[in-house]
């Protein structure tokens, strides 16, 4: 059994990158992983459909338990949907809407992916996390920033937003887990 510490914070003794990290910087996968950050400022245009399709295809190629693929994804780039839902959010959460630069409840993103899981399968949430990681890293590799969101999902599960959750048309039994803006 080998144990090692792992943190994104450099140790006090560390003054630069280790030799092993420097040696792999020419690896595009590692470069993508190391460059990824949560992005909260977006261009006003929706992600192009062909790029979104690539992101989704890479997501569904994520490892998953017993190949159950116990996830469902809905992508929304319809500004009416986002704006109408945001208006309800603002009525329910007026202080949140007072933030400087607030446009919508998804950090002003014009495209949002909603990921649902199957609570009848105990590994579904893990599978959904792996799906999302693939999607986020694919987007990063294409120069598209993203951010996982939980707050808007909590709101979407509220009675005030129930109609919009229903519009996502997830299969019976599936529950919204998180969103990616």
Whereabouts are the PLM-identified features?
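Sec-dependent bacterial lipoprotein signal peptides
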Residues: 1-4
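Beta-hairpin (beta-strand-turn-beta-strand) motif
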Residues: 78, 88, 116-120, 151-152
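Small-aliphatic-rich amphipathic alpha-helix that forms the alpha element of a beta-alpha
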Residues: 59, 119-164
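Proline- and acidic/polar-enriched loop/turn elements at helix boundaries
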Residues: 71, 151, 176-177
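Active-site-flanking beta-strand signature of metal-NTP-handling nucleotidyl enzymes
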Residues: 112-116, 180
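A glycine-rich helix N-cap at a beta->alpha junction
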Residues: 95-97, 103-105, 163-181
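N-terminal amphipathic, basic helical "cap/leader" segment at the start of enzyme domains
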Residues: 6-109
């Amino acid at each position: 059994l080998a144990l090692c510490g792992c943190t994104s914070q450099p140790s006090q003794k560390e003054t630069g990158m280790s030799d092993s990290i420097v040696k792999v910087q020419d690896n595009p996968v590692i470069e993508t992983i190391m460059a990824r950050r949560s992005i909260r400022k977006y261009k006003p245009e929706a992600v192009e459909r062909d790029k979104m399709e690539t992101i989704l295809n890479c997501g569904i190629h994520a490892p998953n338990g017993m190949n159950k693929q116990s996830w469902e994804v809905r992508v929304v780039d319809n500004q009416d949907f986002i704006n109408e839902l945001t208006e309800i959010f603002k009525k329910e959460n007026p202080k949140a809407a007072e933030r400087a630069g607030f446009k919508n409840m998804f950090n002003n993103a014009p495209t949002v992916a909603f990921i649902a899981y199957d609570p009848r399968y105990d590994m579904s949430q893990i599978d959904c996390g792996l799906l999302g990681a693939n999607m986020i890293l694919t987007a990063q590799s294409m120069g598209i920033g993203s951010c996982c969101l939980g707050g808007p999902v909590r709101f979407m599960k509220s009675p005030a937003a129930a109609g919009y959750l229903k519009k996502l048309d997830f299969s019976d039994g599936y529950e919204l887990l998180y969103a990616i803006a």
